[in-house]
Amino acid sequence: IKTILTKSGKEFVTSLSITTLTGTKTFENLFDKELEEEIDHIGLSRWADIIIVMPTTANFMSKLTSGKAEDLATTVILAADKDILLVPAMNVRMWLHKATQKNLEVLQDYGYLFVGPEKGEMACGEFGEGKMSSPRQIFFFLKNYFHKKNIVKDKNLKALVTTGPTREYLDPIRYISN
């Protein structure tokens, strides 16, 4: 797994945490002088078997719909020749907003794949559709995806994950965050 940490994602998790969990460098900047010759947004987009944006915010969906290429995550996605899986997570009102639903339609027409969102209690305390799908649901989607694509079991699958902010509350005090 290679991970791109967005500016918003940095508000919730550090690149050190992600690097420690994945065992690989976390990419953050479009122009990284250290990696200029080693890898770029084109290289990252070609490396992966699938690109996963998790969680996908309403803002990020809007950027993809309009074709913005303003950071590493959006340039990798625009340069990609692979399937892109979006895992939406946002407040129920944001998810139901006409602009978000229009962006959903457009992105589906572009060929983006979606898992979720699910109905449930949000971090803000409201209930409804907009909660990020569980890791288990995402895993089963990916398992089916790779099976349908006929990718062999022993192949070292490559996933590029872009991260942004989300919190899944276990109770009023404790939460899991990416």
Protein language model regions, located:
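A cross-family phosphate/adenosyl-ligand binding-site feature
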Residues: 1-84, 91-178
